[in-house]
């Protein structure tokens, strides 16, 4: 149910963005028609100011609002999957009276500890969870870049860049910037990325049910 709420929320907000951009484009077109019909009526200074204002509105929506929203959705969805995996592992531990739980395992992240628990305690074959497990693991890297590096990868972070680049196709782009040093910004240019994430979360837990690991 929570995932459906995420899906509905994403559609609602994305539709609002699309509507706002369409309205600004119509406004720009209508103004330009008036100017073309009566060019002497409008001073160049006024025209430039008007164009700048409309362009700024579009940039604000497309670059600032849309990017912030999609990055926020990605981090929230990963937090959901991480929390849910922890819950199902803890539930499995209690139901099957396992001698060790997540807190007894070592890992670089809660996601890694969950993987260890699933393979050792629930005898889950991670290969059977593909392609969803690898997808979520790649999403973890995207989320970490958003949260810890403000969606930025520096040019000398070759391994990180290559990992994010290999997962990016059809989901986001790495926009190169060059000031004092080369770096890349993650630009989430595909609104369908959010739905794709949700489908992979659902697919993962559907496969986990075969091992009696339930939500």
Label every model-predicted segment.
Residues 82-85, 89, 93, 97, ...:
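Hydrophobic/aromatic-lined pockets within catalytic cores
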Residues 74-116:
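Short, contiguous, well-structured surface segments enriched in hydrophobic/aromatic residues
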Residues 1-75, 83, 131-137, 141, ...:
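Extended intrinsically disordered or low-complexity regions, especially N/C-terminal cytosolic tails and loops
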């Amino acid at each position: 149910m929570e995932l459906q709420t995420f899906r509905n929320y994403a559609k609602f907000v994305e539709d609002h963005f699309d509507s706002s951009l369409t309205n600004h484009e119509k406004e720009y077109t209508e103004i330009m028609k008036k100017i073309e019909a009566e060019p002497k009526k409008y001073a160049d200074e006024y025209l430039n100011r008007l164009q700048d204002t409309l362009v700024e509105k579009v940039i604000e929506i497309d670059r600032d609002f849309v990017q912030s929203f999609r990055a926020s959705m990605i981090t929230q969805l990963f937090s959901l999957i991480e929390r849910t995996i922890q819950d199902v592992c803890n539930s499995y531990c209690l139901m099957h009276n396992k001698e060790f739980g997540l807190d007894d395992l070592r890992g670089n992240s809660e996601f890694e500890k969950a993987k260890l628990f699933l393979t050792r305690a629930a005898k889950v074959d991670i290969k059977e969870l593909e392609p969803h497990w690898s997808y979520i693991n790649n999403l973890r890297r995207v989320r970490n870049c958003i949260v810890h590096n403000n969606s930025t990868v520096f040019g000398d972070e070759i391994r990180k860049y290559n990992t994010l680049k290999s997962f990016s196709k059809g989901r986001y782009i790495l926009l190169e910037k060059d000031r004092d040093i080369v770096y890349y910004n993650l630009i989430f240019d595909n609104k369908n990325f959010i739905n794709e994430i949700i489908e992979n979360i659902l697919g993962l837990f559907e496969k986990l049910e075969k091992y009696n690991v339930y939500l």
